[in-house]
């Protein structure tokens, strides 16, 4: 101690070896750590192209696949359940017209008060050796062209941090779309775009996903009913027949709308909630214009002739049509 009794304050020394240099690695934020294996979907029925895609997933090879088909026929669900069964991680990215390189490959973000480069979902999938799912791919713009080297199975150079990313073994790309990347001529899928031919050419195969057969669809509907706790096999039969007739009419150009497998699942859930067949159907087809809605309802009453007399529910459900202004009750 000094003679005056006051302790000297000594500045701490800094070990030169502990100083962190500003390197590329220091600019990059940590990757995701959670498990990305999809959850198993109760009541899922494997059908159609499931076995083909299963072989691709199990091969662990890089083999980009483009899956196309009408809305609500299980394209995305099938891919997710394949990975759930294989216990393989999957990153699903929903594509929109606004999706760009920053969204896909990554960009600078504020992380704990510091500016860090946060890898995008494409980079995460490449570095982890897992599957990247580009959902609703045909809604994207030409900004998707940043994925060209990725779809070739090669690495990609991150220009923002001067870093080369090489895909780990097991990395693959799946894409789903309502069109084949040629746009929607009939306007059913407004917002879809014509994708670059060079982009499409990089997908090894294209899988065309139809709606399931009547036998398969009945299993799907019964599975939904069981999941929601309200099983009625006769109702399931009638719903599948009804949807099949509407689809045939749609393909022949007789109607502009179609009943999807997803909509049948919605009806099964509505039936479990309201306990009334016609209420469930009417609520789930109310999104169509009045003429289409009434024709679909009328068709169902012809398929299930006694539905209006036999339907019963403890409560009366009032359904108001915003187009016609009419109010009707379902007993």
Regions found by a protein language model. Name each.
Residues 1-330:
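C-terminal regulatory/interaction module of P-loop NTP-utilizing enzymes
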């Amino acid at each position: 101690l000094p003679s005056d009794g006051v302790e000297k304050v000594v500045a701490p020394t800094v070990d030169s070896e502990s100083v962190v240099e500003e390197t590329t690695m220091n600019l990059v934020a940590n990757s995701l750590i959670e498990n990305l294996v999809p959850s198993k979907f109760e009541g899922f029925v494997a059908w159609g192209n499931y076995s083909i895609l299963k072989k691709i997933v199990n091969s662990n090879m890089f083999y980009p696949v483009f899956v196309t088909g009408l809305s609500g026929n299980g394209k995305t669900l099938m891919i997710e359940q394949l990975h759930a069964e294989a216990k393989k991680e999957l990153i699903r990215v929903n594509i929109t017209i606004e999706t760009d390189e920053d969204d896909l490959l990554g960009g600078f973000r504020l992380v704990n008060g510091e500016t860090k480069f946060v890898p995008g979902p494409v980079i995460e999938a490449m570095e982890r050796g897992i599957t990247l799912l580009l959902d609703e791919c045909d809604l994207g713009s030409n900004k998707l062209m940043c994925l060209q080297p990725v779809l070739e199975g090669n690495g990609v150079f991150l220009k923002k941090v001067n870093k080369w990313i090489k895909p780990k073994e097991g990395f693959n790309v799946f894409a789903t779309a309502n069109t084949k990347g040629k746009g929607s001529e009939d306007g059913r899928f407004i917002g879809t775009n014509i994708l670059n031919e060079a982009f499409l050419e990089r997908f090894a195969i294209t899988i065309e996903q139809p709606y399931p057969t009547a036998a398969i669809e009945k299993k799907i509907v019964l599975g939904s009913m069981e999941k929601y706790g309200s099983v009625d096999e006769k109702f399931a039969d009638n719903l599948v027949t009804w949807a099949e007739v509407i689809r045939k009419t749609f393909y022949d150009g007789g109607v502009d709308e179609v009943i999807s497998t997803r909509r049948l699942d919605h009806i099964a859930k509505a039936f479990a909630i309201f306990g009334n067949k016609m209420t469930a159907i009417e609520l789930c087809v109310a999104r169509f214009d009045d003429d289409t809605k009434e024709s679909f309802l009328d068709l169902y009453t012809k398929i299930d002739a006694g539905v209006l007399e036999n339907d019963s529910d403890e409560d009366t459900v009032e359904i108001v049509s915003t187009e016609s202004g009419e109010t009707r009750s379902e007993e």
